[in-house]
Amino acid sequence: RRVLFRSQAVINEAHSRGLVVPDRVRGKEGETQAAGAYVAYPKKGLHEWIGSMDLNSLYPSVIRALNMSPETIVGQIRQDRTKDMIRNGMASGMSFAECWEGKFACLEYDIVMNQDIGEDIIIDWENGKSQQVSGKEAYDIIFLNGQSLMLSANGTIFTYETKGVIPGLLERWYAERKDLQKKAKTAGDSKEFEFWDKRQLVKKINLNSAYGALLNAGSRSEEHTSELQSRGLISYAV
């Protein structure tokens, strides 16, 4: 039921914008498994000045920050180097997760963010065109040409000219939760506090479970969001 609720919420959000939601195309089981999140390995030993932080609604915040939604994808950097790295690692006996040890993003993302002039990458645009450029040129195209583009750690390029359906839905839920939290704080008695507190908790669960629900095989959006997840920052978190 939770999966159906979140899937229907996305559909309703799209319809409210006058958008048509594609029919679901059923694939074979196991074709679209989601990768696990990025986990940094601890550095053993005694350390000074240790700190920690807890990002507010991490996955929803990442989706909103990069405007991640299937309809906002405008390009994808080919992951040739990254695929070779994984293929070679697994051939040597490493697991898929072990191939990613110590890495936050795909190798091509690092080339772009380091503005490497000696390494070329290929960008496949949604309009069917492909473009071979250096890391520096790709950085300029994405961040410096005023094209309202964002780049995820897996090399997916999103536009933020218009707000995506999924980020827009999460933004509304987030605002609604904040409003419910305010009502809980100003409640006149414990019964009223409990009423509003439970409602804000429901919103919190909706926000934090949306990522997994949209990737669930029972979700109508699964075949679209699994592609998004496999290419997006939320695979490895921030």
Q: Whereabouts are the PLM-identified features?
A:
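Conserved acidic
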Residues: 1-226
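Short "domain-exit" segments at the C-terminal end of structured domains
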Residues: 227-238
